[in-house]
């Protein structure tokens, strides 16, 4: 099975680590703006260096032909770009990729990494951006009955669904990777705010048992990997979104537990 990955930050590293351990995945193509040290020496990984993720050449699409799915983790940090660039990176680019990748196979799973609570906290800019991205991507999902209620001010342009496009959204909140040693060598030095979160906030939340807004990197990795290799059916686990296409922190925890206990009871893989 051939899977595409975009994004080389924390979530991308988590996704790659999970897929490297999955025997059913025999090829991983990473589309990245720069080399990926984590992929070096991994025989089933190919890295395509591409600065512009808005368009894909015939040569690149030929290399991707037959892929089963994509985990999309790419997106610039807010502090590094303008708001226009941020929206382009988190909304427009995944939508463009979704349209291009949908033609790679008869059924193509697209796992978009969003954020937990994004539709309930749209007053927060970064959450609103993720919610808008989900609204647009769900327009493309092969089953129009799964489309989200459009709450973006002014609405969005309606688009036809793509018969081959199968969407899942993964919605992490705080990610605890304190015990995920396999990815630590590949992570960039943390800015002060992230160090504060990892050193103070996460331990405090663990102590207080506030698990509804945090999850482990292992849970996140398994959920992303399982959905991208799945047969595309709805997710049937406590904590999944009402339409059965999205998992937040609680859903991912329940998903991991269900998969470990009874793999046949969740999405077939």
From Swiss-Prot:
The signal sequence is 1-15
Keyword Repeat among UniProt keywords: no
Superkingdom is: Eukaryota
Q: Which UniProt keywords apply?
A: Glycoprotein, Signal
Using the UniProt annotation, give the residues that carry a glycan (glycosylation sites).
254
Q: What induces it?
A: Expression is positively regulated by the leucinostatins biosynthesis cluster-specific transcription regulator lcsF.
Q: Which InterPro entries match?
A: NAD(P)-bd_dom_sf
Q: What does this protein do?
A: Part of the gene cluster that mediates the biosynthesis of the lipopeptide antibiotics leucinostatins that show extensive biological activities, including antimalarial, antiviral, antibacterial, antifungal, and antitumor activities, as well as phytotoxic. The function of lcsT within the leucinostatins biosynthesis has not been identified yet.
* Protein's UniProt name: Leucinostatins biosynthesis cluster protein T
- Which source organism? Purpureocillium lilacinum
């Amino acid at each position: 099975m051939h899977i595409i990955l975009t994004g080389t930050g924390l979530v991308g590293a988590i996704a790659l680590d999970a897929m490297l351990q999955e025997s059913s995945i025999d090829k991983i193509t990473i589309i990245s703006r720069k080399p990926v040290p984590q992929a070096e020496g991994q025989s089933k990984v190919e890295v395509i260096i591409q600065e512009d993720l808005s368009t894909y050449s015939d040569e690149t699409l030929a290399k991707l032909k037959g892929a089963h799915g994509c985990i999309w983790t790419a997106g610039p940090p807010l502090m590094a770009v303008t708001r226009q660039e941020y929206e382009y990176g988190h909304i427009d680019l995944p939508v463009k990729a979704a349209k291009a990748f949908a033609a790679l196979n008869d059924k193509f799973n697209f796992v978009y990494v969003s954020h937990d609570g994004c539709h309930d906290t749209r007053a927060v800019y970064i959450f609103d951006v993720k919610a808008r991205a989900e609204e647009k991507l769900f327009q493309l999902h092969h089953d129009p009955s799964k489309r989200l209620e459009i709450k973006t001010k002014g609405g969005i342009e309606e688009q036809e669904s793509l018969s081959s496009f199968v969407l899942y959204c993964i919605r992490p909140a705080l990610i605890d990777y304190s015990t995920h040693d396999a990815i630590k060598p590949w992570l960039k030095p943390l800015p002060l705010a992230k160090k504060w979160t990892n050193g103070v906030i996460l331990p405090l939340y663990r102590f207080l048992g506030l698990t509804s807004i945090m999850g482990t990197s292992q849970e996140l990795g398994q959920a992303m990997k399982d959905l991208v290799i799945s047969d595309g059916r709805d997710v049937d686990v406590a904590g999944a979104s009402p339409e059965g296409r999205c998992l937040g922190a609680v859903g991912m925890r329940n998903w991991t537990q269900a998969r470990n206990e009874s793999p046949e009871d969740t999405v077939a893989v």
